[in-house]
A protein has these predicted regions:
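His/acidic/aromatic-lined binding-pocket segments of jelly-roll/cupin-type domains
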Residues: 12, 120-121
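Phosphate/oxyanion-binding loops and surfaces in catalytic or ligand/nucleic-acid-binding neighborhoods
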Residues: 21, 69, 157
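Surface-exposed amphipathic alpha-helical segments
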Residues: 16-18, 129-157
């Protein structure tokens, strides 16, 4: 199994069935091409996952102590997906790589497909690490189980 690095904070042993996305898939899924991000796909379940890391400015770092990073990401996702029938289902919290992660689950429509997404954010000082997944709603139960296996495989550096 392939060992991957997420930013400067986490590693991931790619679980069975997942593989890194190709450049063509990155373009198709509108994923940034950067050393600070990676994308994974599990074709059997049509799961697309992306992870990324960024450091924010000192000013934004101060705001992160006032505004929840997960709430900020949720506002951004809801704005970006407004034309796709975005609907938040619930807030989420869990550990990823031994760190507290806050997130949310939502639904949206992509073409004729009803989709489910989850996003998590880990804040550490001025660093933010993001974890996102997108999967068809008809595969929700098995897809979210695979997603949780992937998140369970994340380790802190």
């Amino acid at each position: 199994m392939e060992q991957l690095t997420i930013g400067k904070r986490f590693t991931l042993t790619c679980p069975e069935g997942f593989r890194p996305v190709t450049k063509e898939e990155r373009d198709r899924f509108h994923m940034p091409e950067s050393d600070d991000s990676l994308g994974l796909i599990r074709e059997d379940d049509r799961i697309v996952a992306s992870m990324g890391w960024k450091e924010v400015s000192a000013f934004a770092g101060v705001l992160l102590h006032v505004i929840s990073p997960a709430a900020s990401v949720e506002a951004s996702v809801s704005r970006d997906m407004a034309g796709y029938g975005y609907r938040k289902e619930k807030s989420l919290s869990r550990e990823i790589g031994g760190q507290k992660a806050e997130g949310f689950r939502y639904t949206y429509t992509a073409g004729d497909n009803f989709m489910v997404g989850e996003s998590y954010v880990i804040r550490s000082g001025r660093s933010l690490t993001f974890f996102h997944v997108y999967l068809p709603d008809e595969l929700r139960e098995q897809g979210l189980a695979r997603w949780n296996e992937l998140l369970d495989a994340v380790q802190s550096l």
